[in-house]
């Protein structure tokens, strides 16, 4: 599995994955789009701007949009790396949000995606990453713990874990 920035050549694979998330009415943490008004090329440009901190909503922070793929180029999931924390992210969202497409869950992809996402965080000088999950999401909790997460506390149904990035 590889985690990387999406490109134009990934359009079909990513659109198909997005359609699965929508069809299954599944949360897509780590991947942001408006299904009613989506243009892939604009999404790519918005991702580039968000990484540079340009033209983002006032309450957002610069972030890197990444997508995980298998060796054949099949899109597996999303990961969003926030380059700093604001008050909301410190309470609820953390540095990293991620999701694996419904048909590929339970196969270890989330664990590997978070591992690779933490390496990108390290490249961006984030040496201690906050990763959160709902108290109702034992699968995500297991992913975070498998990547070295240390529980700090639980706030309003959100478990907050810190991971030392090595």
Could you describe each region identified by the protein language model?
Residues 121-132:
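Conserved GNAT acetyl-CoA-binding A-motif
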Residues 73, 88, 105-106, 136:
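Glycine-/small-residue-rich active-site loops that bind phosphorylated ligands and cofactors
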Residues 97-100, 106-123, 141-146:
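Conserved acetyl-CoA-binding loop-helix of GNAT-fold acetyltransferases
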Residues 131-141:
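Conserved beta-strand-loop-alpha-helix junction that forms the acyl-donor binding cleft
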Residues 2, 97, 130-132:
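Short aromatic/hydrophobic contact patches that present stacked aromatics
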Residues 1-95, 156-166:
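GNAT-family acyltransferases
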Residues 132, 145-163:
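Conserved catalytic-core motifs of GNAT/GCN5-like acyltransferases
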């Amino acid at each position: 599995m590889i985690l990387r920035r999406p490109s134009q050549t990934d359009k079909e694979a990513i659109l198909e994955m997005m359609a699965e998330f929508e069809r299954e009415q599944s949360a897509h943490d780590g991947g942001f789009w408006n299904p009613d008004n989506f243009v892939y090329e604009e999404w790519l440009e918005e991702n580039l701007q968000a990484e540079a901190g340009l033209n983002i909503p006032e309450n957002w922070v610069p972030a890197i949009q990444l997508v995980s793929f298998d060796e054949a180029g099949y899109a597996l999931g999303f990961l969003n790396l926030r380059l700093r924390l604001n008050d909301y992210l410190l309470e609820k969202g953390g540095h990293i949000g991620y999701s694996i497409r419904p048909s590929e869950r339970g196969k270890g992809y989330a664990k590997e995606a978070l591992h690779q996402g933490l390496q990108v965080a390290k490249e961006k000088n984030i040496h201690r990453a906050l990763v959160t999950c709902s108290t109702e999401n034992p699968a995500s909790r297991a992913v975070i713990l498998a990547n070295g997460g240390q529980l700090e506390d639980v706030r309003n149904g959100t478990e907050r874990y810190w991971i030392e990035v090595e």
